From Swiss-Prot:
Example of a GO cellular component annotation carried by this entry: ribonucleoprotein complex
Classification lineage: Bacteria, Pseudomonadati, Pseudomonadota, Gammaproteobacteria, Alteromonadales
Keyword Ribonucleoprotein: yes
InterPro entries, alphabetized: Ribosomal_uL10 (IPR001790), Ribosomal_uL10-like_sf (IPR043141), Ribosomal_uL10_bac (IPR022973), Ribosomal_uL10_bac_type (IPR047865)
Subunit structure: Part of the ribosomal stalk of the 50S ribosomal subunit. The N-terminus interacts with L11 and the large rRNA to form the base of the stalk. The C-terminus forms an elongated spine to which L12 dimers bind in a sequential fashion forming a multimeric L10(L12)X complex.
Name of protein: Large ribosomal subunit protein uL10
Record flagged with keyword tRNA-binding: no
UniProt KW keywords: Ribonucleoprotein, Ribosomal protein, RNA-binding, rRNA-binding
The protein's role, per its UniProt record: Forms part of the ribosomal stalk, playing a central role in the interaction of the ribosome with GTP-bound translation factors.
Cited SUPFAM superfamilies: Ribosomal protein L10-like
Protein family per UniProt: Belongs to the universal ribosomal protein uL10 family.
Length: 164
């Protein structure tokens, strides 16, 4: 189906707007995946703050040109499903890797974060903000418990030396 020039410009502008407000991008090939499954994926994407769309390759290349995601423009071959994470850098990657496990025809092509092409699985393993805060708090809590134990050991050693 032919798209007129104004529609093409609108699509490029829409993708550029999503790219400019995003932390990361993930590109996948969804050939052979049922429409119902893609509909469920789109719903999950909206719930997780992920913007996704099937975009023609030339339009996608033009849209990411001049953005920090230009590093993945060479993977736009064949049908491309592009997803931008705006809330959390790993949201789209996590969503797509989980979906790929359930749908063998869903192929992850590439991902980019902070201007660099990265492994999709590495990006998916990034902790969310809440997970990172809880990890930091547990490390701080463990550190204070360790300090307390070392203090008790030092007091014990000091008393043993005084008794001797």
């Amino acid at each position: 189906m032919a798209i007129n020039l104004d529609d093409k410009k609108a699509i490029v502008a829409e993708v550029q707007e999503a790219a400019n407000g995003a932390h990361s991008v993930v590109i996948a090939d969804a050939r052979g995946v049922a429409v119902e499954a893609i509909t469920v994926l789109r719903k999950q994407a909206r719930e997780n703050g992920v913007w996704m769309k099937v975009v023609r390759n030339t339009l996608a290349r033009r849209a990411v040109e001049g953005t920090e995601f230009e590093c993945v423009s060479d993977v736009f071959k064949g049908p491309s499903l592009i997803a931008f994470s705006s809330d959390h850098p790993g949201a789209a990657a996590r969503l797509f890797t989980d979906f790929a496990k359930a749908n063998e025809n869903f192929e992850l092509k590439a991902a980019a974060f902070e201007g660099n092409a990265v492994d999709v699985n590495m990006l998916a393993k990034l902790p969310t903000y809440d997970e990172a805060i809880s990890r930091l708090m547990s490390v701080m809590k463990e550190a204070s418990a360790g300090k307390l134990a070392r203090t008790f050991a030092a007091i014990r050693d000091q008393k043993e030396q005084e008794a001797a």
